[in-house]
Amino acid sequence: MSDKDTGMAQELKIPPSALMLGLAGLIPFYGLAIWQGITPDELLSERLITAFVLYAACILSFLGGVGWGLAMSETDQLQRGLTFGISTAPSLVGWAAAFINVQNLPFSLSILAMAFLLQGLWDWRLAASGRAPHWFGTLRIGLTIAVISALALAWMMRPELAGTSGSL
C-alpha cells in the first residue's frame, strides 16, 4: 500500500477518540430525555427538560466552533467570511431555542431538530468538499441522526406532548 493509499485510508477511518467522545456526548441527550419523561416529580421534569435544551444549545455552539476553526485556515477571503458567518448561527439558534423553551417547548425542540439537521448537512458538506477530513462527515451524520432521535424521544416522553404534533 502506498503512502497516498495509507493516508486516504486514515482519512476515512474515524479516530477512536473522536468516535468515543462523540458517542459519550449522546449520554446526556438520552439520559435527560428518558429521565424527564419517567420522573413523577413535575418540577424535576421541568428542570430536566430545561437541562436537555440547554445541553443541546451548548452542543450546537460547540459544532459552530468547529466551523470557526476551519474558517481560520481558509485562504479564499469570501469563503472564509461565509464560513465564519455560518459558524456563528448554531450558537445563536441554540440560544433562541433555550429562550423559547420557557414559552413553547414543541417549538424549541423543533428548532433544535432543524438546527442539528442543517449543522449535520453543513458538516458533511465541509468533509465532502475536502475542507474537513472525510471521517468528520461520516461521524457527524451518524451523531446528527442520534441527536435528532433523542430530541424526538424527549418530545414523545413529555406527558403533555405525547401523541400530539404540538402547536407551533
How should each PLM-predicted stretch be described?
Residues 44-59:
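Loop-to-helix transition at the N-terminal end of transmembrane alpha-helices
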Residues 5-10, 64-76, 120-132:
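C-terminal ends of transmembrane helices
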Residues 69-100:
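Helix-adjacent hinge/juxtasegments
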Residues 153-168:
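Juxtamembrane boundary at the C-terminal end of a transmembrane helix
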Residues 126-148:
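Interfacial loop-to-transmembrane junctions
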Residues 98-118:
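Transmembrane helix-loop-helix
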